[in-house]
Amino acid sequence: MRKIINNPEHVVDEMMEGYISAYSRYYVKHPDVNGVILKQRRKDKVALVIGGGSGHEPMFSGFVGKGLADAAACGNIFASPDPNTIYQTAKAVEQGKGVLFVYGCYAGDNLNFDMGEEFLNDDGIQTAHVRVWDDVASAPQERIEDRRGIAGDVFVVKIAGAACDAGLELEEVVRVTEKARDNTRTIGVATAPAQLPGVEQPIFTLGEGEIEYGMGLHGERGVLRTTWEDADVLAEKMYKQILDDSDLKTGDEVCVLVNGLGSTTITELAIAFRKVKKLLDADGIKVYDTDLNNYCTSQEMGGFSITLFKLDEELKKYYDMPCYCPYYAKGELTGNTGEAAGGQTEDVQIKSEPEFDVNDVEAAEIVRSKAGILEELNAADARNMLLYIADKIIAKKPYL
């Protein structure tokens, strides 16, 4: 597959240059490493640093923002950032209250972030980390700490950022973030492979008409390869696997993320969510908020993932706190899309002025007599209005 790039060896550097240039009002690049730094940061709080390999955009660089991460340490395509990048990026945003690292649970990330923490500790900076392991297909429940981190990063970063902005101490930020992580479950399905820049072959192969449940973001083997299935069948299988792995029950509230893996359209994500919503309704589980988007991707991989994030009152408080970055926002202006108000909706009442000249005696008389709403419109009134409209259309005929 052809990619819109120049030299494959410069993809990350050029992507970083373009990204920082596009959003220079928010970000600055670290002068020495591939770190995205938020310009306007709150002082006197725990710093939140996220990171991982590039190629999953907008995760991780795209989740630096108000109420989210203070910085992101970015590696090469599908490769962990090196310890120095992690160290330098965190050092740039540390405010004296410590640093929390949030990243997906992968061997390279675990090793390099641990080393980055050691460098910071040597400087007298307090650190902690929360590894995201939401992928239910990657290891059984008894080995949950071996699971991979995938689209569940979105919810964990959201809660961690809010907890930091709330002014919690590092120990408390870790507790809240771990609760968010432990309440998050994801499974994905791949319908087409991804391809690395400059590499001739895709990172895995799928036969014509095949799909794979549980495929990882880097092409890691899934749990089941099967023939093509309709959206409702896919969504139901994925939903049931998440439910079997969680303690969700009737009366619980969840946030839902249907995440595209790179080349899947919003149309398809919406169709998948439609089925998930019906299944949740049938089980008596309330939807508090929903996102359908490509947040955690794998180049041009086809497919999607479903994430369920179980809320309690504490997590809901942090989820509702405002946040903003170019790719993700929550707060008063965005509200939530679910049933937080008991499923009640309010019809929007639009008050509009008449589009005709009220100085026109005939039309104005109709408006005055019917108080603008025309609740008791009779045949004569209707005839007069239609004649008036017809006359206006005829008068504008040269322009139509």
Model region roles, listed by residue range:
Residues 1-400:
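N-terminal loops that bind phosphate or other acidic moieties
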